[in-house]
Amino acid sequence: MRILFTGLENERYRPELGKTNEHHNFYLLLKADPKNDVTYIPFDRALEVGKRAYNKELLDTVRREKPDLFWAFMYTDELEYDTLDEIKKLTTSVAWFSDDHWRLENYSRFYAPHFTKVITTWSKAKEQYAKYGITNVIRSQWGFNSGVYRSVVVPGQDINVSFVGMRTPHREKIINDLRNAGINVFVRGYKWDEGRASFDEMLEIFSRSKVNLNLNPPMSALAIKPLAQIFFRRRRNLIVPDFLHISRNLRSFFQKRIPQIKARPFEITGSGGFCITGSADDMENYFVPDKEIVIYKDTKDLIDKIRYYLEHEDERRVIAKAGYERALKEHTYNARLSEVFRQLELD
């Protein structure tokens, strides 16, 4: 299959922050399939040539190469509606939307009509899109690329508890609460003093850790950054005023407090790690709690569960093995995309 893929290549448009989730999990997966011929024109290109020239390059490529599929992993306003409308006339076009639980109101629903199909991970997205007359929606879910995520051979599990991910005020509070309870947490990620972990370092941390955490607590209503998103929005690598859309931004703000499934539990289990995660959306449909993954309710419950599983190695290893087997069987992006392609009649 001939595919034109676009998405953000470098985190926040900054090469020093490393490659994005979509680069590791979607682009590399599609490229690795010998049946695919993938052309990659990342959003980052728009910073080099300008937004309009980047969109023209996409359209010219579609006209010249005649791909079977145009795949966009959406970020901000990189793609122009008129470009998408022309591409939609020429080939099957698909958008993967992240965070529809809060971005649907002020972002996704405006782009969705300009694609053949759009993909969402939120369990309630289809009914929300339907309120706006949008029906070209496929429900999928995060997963992991089994071609790059793997268990790493390490001398032993010398890290009791780890968290790999961006520092946010609510995550920092949980980490501090754990440390105050006597639990030493190894952290790496954007904005932490310890710094980011490279992709290979992250895989090593998953294997070295007895307990890997996925922290997705509800956003605080008083957090500065979420409040700022009522009045401002991201445009590629910039933050710009958005005073004209305060009403819909408010609706998005309140939706953002709903914990959602993230990719990390699939990545940890898919790498053979033992994962404790916060409850989110319909997580129980993807892993059996206490059998394949462990779910905590609040910080006190998290502290209790960490202490328990640090003391019960055999149970921890049984759960990690079951989680790995479930992830490898059902939650790879190969499985996710095969189902998407089936619905697109491209398999």
PLM region descriptions:
Residues 1-57, 65, 72-77, 113-289:
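Nucleotide-sugar donor-binding catalytic core of glycosyltransferases
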Residues 30, 311-342:
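A charged, aromatic-enriched C-terminal amphipathic alpha-helix characteristic of glycosyltransferases
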Residues 57-58, 82, 106-107, 200-201, ...:
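Short acidic active-site motifs
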Residues 86-100:
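Active-site proximal beta-strand in glycosyltransferases
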Residues 101-116:
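Membrane-proximal helix-turn-helix segments that form the acceptor-binding/catalytic region
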Residues 262, 293-299, 309-313:
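Conserved acidic donor-binding segment of nucleotide-sugar-dependent glycosyltransferases
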